[in-house]
A protein has these predicted regions:
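Bacterial Sec-dependent N-terminal signal peptides
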Residues: 1-24
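Extracellular and organelle-lumenal recognition/adhesion modules and their flexible linkers in secreted
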Residues: 18-312
Length: 313
C-alpha cells in the first residue's frame, strides 16, 4: 500500500507546485477609453538599403552596376570565391576582436555581359578615369565585328520597359584611336527583339564623351534589356551607363520610382528616417555610410559595399 501511495503523492505535489508557479495575470484593453495623445509628428517611415530596397527598388535607375564600381572593396578586405572577408573589427566596449564574412559575387563584371565570347572581350580597368572618386571603367575589345557586338545589361531582374514611354539614357564613353565604327544604344525585349534604337554620337576619339539621349520602346517588355552595340573592331572604354524612366516621382531627373514613391507619400509620414540603422555604422569604420558622398554628379559617386551584403550605388 505504501508503494502505491508514494507515486500519487509525488504527482499531487508536482501539480501543486505548477499551480503556484503560474499566478493568474491578465491584460485588459478598454477600447472605449482614450489613452495618451500621440503627436502626429511621431508617425514616420524608415528607409534602409536592405534586399534592394533602394537599387532595384525605390530608386528609378534601371541599370545594374552603372558605374562599374561594384567590385570595389574597402582597404584591408579580400575575397575568396563567393565570400568577402572584411578586416577584423575590435568592439569598442568589450575589446573583443571579431572576424566576419559576407556574400560576394563571382561575376567578372557584375550586371554586364557580351553577346559573344569569341569576337570580343571585356575587363575592368582604371585607365584614364573620368572621375577619381569612381575610377573603374570597362574596356571592351572588339576583335571581329562581322556581326555587331552588344554590351548588355538586364538591370535588376529585367527592365520594365513600357510602350511609348520615354527613357533617358546617359553614357560616358571613350573610343580608342583604333575604333572607327559607330555606337548604337538599343532597348531589347527579353527575347532580344529591338524595341528602340538610337545612335550614340561620339565626337572625340581618345577622350571621354558624356552623352544623353531619349529612347521610346515600340512595345512593352517586363524583362527588357539595354545594350550598346559596336559595329567595328577596336577598343572602347565605357565609364558610365544610366537609364531612367522619364516619368519619375514628381518628374525629377535621377529620381524615385513613381509607383513606389506615391505609395509611401500616401502614408503621409511626418518624417523619413534615412539611411537606416546598421548601414550607418558599416561593417567597419572604413565602409560606414558617408552621406556627403551621395551628393553631386551620380557618375562621380563611389558607391559602397554595405553591411547587408551588397554594393549600393
Amino acid at each position: 500500500m505504501k508503494k502505491i501511495f508514494l507515486p500519487f503523492a509525488a504527482v499531487a505535489l508536482l501539480l501543486s507546485s505548477c499551480k503556484d508557479a503560474a499566478p493568474k495575470e491578465e491584460l485588459v484593453i478598454n477600447l472605449q477609453e482614450k489613452g495618451a495623445e500621440v503627436a502626429p509628428s511621431m508617425y514616420g517611415i524608415f528607409f534602409e538599403e536592405i534586399n534592394h530596397a533602394g537599387d532595384g527598388g525605390l530608386y528609378a535607375e534601371l541599370v545594374k552596376n552603372r558605374s562599374f564600381e561594384e567590385l570595389e572593396m574597402p582597404e584591408g578586405y579580400y575575397a575568396e570565391g563567393d565570400v568577402l572577408h572584411p578586416k577584423k573589427v575590435c568592439n569598442h566596449i568589450s575589446g573583443e576582436v571579431r572576424e566576419g564574412s559576407f556574400r560576394w559575387t563571382t561575376e567578372p563584371v557584375p550586371g554586364w555581359t557580351l553577346s559573344t565570347k569569341d569576337a570580343a572581350e571585356m575587363k575592368l580597368t582604371k585607365e584614364q578615369p573620368k572621375f577619381s572618386t569612381a575610377p573603374n571603367n570597362l574596356k571592351v575589345t572588339i576583335k571581329n565585328a562581322s556581326t555587331p557586338v552588344r554590351l548588355i545589361n538586364e538591370g535588376y531582374w529585367g527592365m520594365n520597359l513600357v510602350k511609348d514611354n520615354s527613357y533617358q539614357l546617359r553614357t560616358i564613353i571613350r573610343p580608342a584611336s583604333d575604333y572607327k565604327g559607330k555606337v548604337t544604344a538599343l532597348l531589347l525585349s527579353e527575347q532580344g527583339e529591338v524595341l528602340a534604337s538610337a545612335p550614340v554620337d561620339i565626337t572625340a576619339a581618345g577622350q571621354w564623351n558624356d552623352l544623353s539621349l531619349a529612347m521610346q520602346p515600340t512595345a512593352t517588355s517586363a524583362k527588357g534589356k539595354l545594350a550598346l552595340e559596336f559595329d567595328a573592331p577596336g577598343t572602347v572604354y565605357v565609364d558610365y551607363v544610366s537609364l531612367f524612366p522619364e516619368k519619375t516621382f514628381h518628374d525629377r531627373p535621377n529620381g524615385l520610382r513613381k509607383d513606389v514613391a506615391e505609395i509611401l507619400e500616401g502614408l503621409h509620414p511626418a518624417f523619413v528616417r534615412w539611411p537606416g540603422g546598421c548601414v550607418v555604422e558599416g561593417i567597419s569604420l572604413e565602409n560606414r555610410f558617408e552621406w556627403k558622398k551621395s551628393l553631386g554628379d551620380p557618375a562621380a559617386r563611389s558607391g559602397e559595399y554595405s553591411t547587408w551584403g551588397k554594393s549600393e550605388a
